């Protein structure tokens, strides 16, 4: 009995060690976004609350928590209230299989890639439930757009994952990282470059970020699926979006960019200088790079039209992944060096 309780407490501690820093990261990602976009637009960004505006995320959180939760009169009240949780939970449970370094992972399962793919697909249910339960045409339009978008880009993302499985020969994320040992030239983003780019673009679309944020199109459907939400409900949708951004960036770093591996591995004099840097620091740097590109893309590109979004998914990304899967299979059979 005591042994079981001890195991349970240890699991809870491991979950908190992952979730608490993640929530703090989400808070400061919103701050980073406002700062980066501010500098791109030749503005300063938030700089009033705390030193250089560093406490702004907590001020925003306090504001949202203290706001009234308004439930529309003709909405389905129970589904309306729990929909934000349906959106948030998949973006958190995906972290269970993410290895931060060799041996540092909550659940080192052999079907890690499949688990991540399944969890990333579940987030759309929260959006769909929110749109339907709100009993608002704007919310419903946003939810339907998001569902169609997710279905379209999940296919391309799935094919891109198959390419990694072909190359690494495993669905275990730790094994996939270890298959990229030998330095930057051995990372999968080089032989699988088209699949890497497709996965990256699909990840932006999956998280409903600009220029694929049609589900929230302010200029067309007010605020999309969360138009009726305020206070903590709105905050949870906000949280799920940014947590998903961090998760997609982490998956990109693990599958294509060597995860926690040093980029200087195999380069003797640089390897000797940077060998003291822990693996998880390299992983955090790679995640930060992908997150910065998320913000840069949002500030740079205009929103796609709905037909352009669908055309890109079905007529460009899916054919590209199918063709490159065939090329990858041929490279694996031919044992193309230094990757296979």
Curated annotation (Swiss-Prot):
InterPro entries: NADH_UbQ_OxRdtase_su1/FPO, NADH_UbQ_OxRdtase_su1_CS. The chain crosses the membrane at residues 4-24, 78-98, 113-133, 151-171, 184-204, 244-264, 273-293, 316-336. Its main location: membrane. It is found in: Cell inner membrane. One of its GO terms (molecular function) is NADH dehydrogenase activity. The keyword Lipid metabolism does not apply. GO terms for cellular component: plasma membrane. It catalyses: a quinone + NADH + 5 H(+)(in) = a quinol + NAD(+) + 4 H(+)(out). Keywords: Cell inner membrane, Cell membrane, Membrane, NAD, Quinone, Translocase, Transmembrane, Transmembrane helix, Ubiquinone. It is a multi-pass membrane protein. Pfam families: NADHdh (PF00146). The keyword Membrane applies. Its EC number is 7.1.1.-. It comes from the Bacteria. GO terms for biological process: aerobic respiration. It is an enzyme of class 7 (translocase). HAMAP family: NDH1_NuoH (MF_01350). NDH-1 shuttles electrons from NADH, via FMN and iron-sulfur (Fe-S) centers, to quinones in the respiratory chain. The immediate electron acceptor for the enzyme in this species is believed to be ubiquinone. Couples the redox reaction to proton translocation (for every two electrons transferred, four hydrogen ions are translocated across the cytoplasmic membrane), and thus conserves the redox energy in a proton gradient. This subunit may bind ubiquinone. Belongs to the complex I subunit 1 family. NDH-1 is composed of 14 different subunits. Subunits NuoA, H, J, K, L, M, N constitute the membrane sector of the complex. This is NADH-quinone oxidoreductase subunit H.
């Amino acid at each position: 009995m005591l042994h079981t309780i001890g195991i349970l407490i240890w699991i809870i501690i491991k979950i908190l060690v992952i979730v608490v820093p993640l929530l703090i990261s989400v808070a400061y990602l919103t701050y980073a976004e406002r700062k980066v976009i501010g500098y791109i637009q030749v503005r300063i960004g938030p700089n009033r609350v705390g030193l250089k505006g560093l406490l702004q995320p907590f001020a925003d959180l306090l504001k949202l928590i203290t706001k009234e939760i308004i439930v529309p009169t003709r909405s389905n009240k129970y589904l309306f209230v729990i929909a934000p949780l349906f959106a948030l939970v998949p973006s958190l449970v995906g972290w269970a299989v993410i290895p931060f370094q060799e041996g540092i992972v909550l659940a080192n399962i052999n079907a890690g890639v499949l688990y991540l793919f399944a969890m990333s697909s579940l987030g759309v249910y929260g959006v769909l439930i929110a749109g339907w339960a709100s009993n608002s045409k704007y919310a419903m339009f946003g939810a339907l757009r998001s569902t169609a978008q997710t279905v379209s880009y999940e296919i391309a993302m799935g094919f891109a994952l198959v390419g990694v499985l072909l190359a690494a020969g495993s669905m275990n994320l730790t094994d996939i990282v270890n298959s990229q040992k030998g330095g930057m030239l051995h990372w999968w983003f080089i032989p699988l470059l088209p699949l890497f780019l497709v996965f990256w673009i699909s990840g932006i679309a999956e998280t409903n970020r600009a220029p694929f944020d049609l589900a929230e199109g302010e200029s067309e459907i007010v605020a999309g699926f969360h138009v009726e939400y305020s206070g903590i409900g709105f905050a949870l949708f906000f949280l799920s979006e940014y947590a998903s951004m961090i998760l997609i960036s982490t998956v990109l770093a693990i599958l294509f960019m060597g995860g926690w591996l040093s980029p200087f591995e195999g380069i003797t004099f640089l390897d000797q200088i940077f060998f003291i840097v822990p693996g998880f620091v390299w992983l955090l740097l790679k995640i930060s790079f992908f997150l910065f590109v998320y913000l840069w893309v949002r500030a740079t590109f205009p929103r796609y039209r709905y037909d352009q979004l669908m055309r890109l998914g079905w007529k460009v990304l899916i054919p590209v992944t199918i063709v490159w899967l065939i090329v990858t299979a041929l490279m694996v059979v031919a044992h193309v060096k230094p990757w296979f």
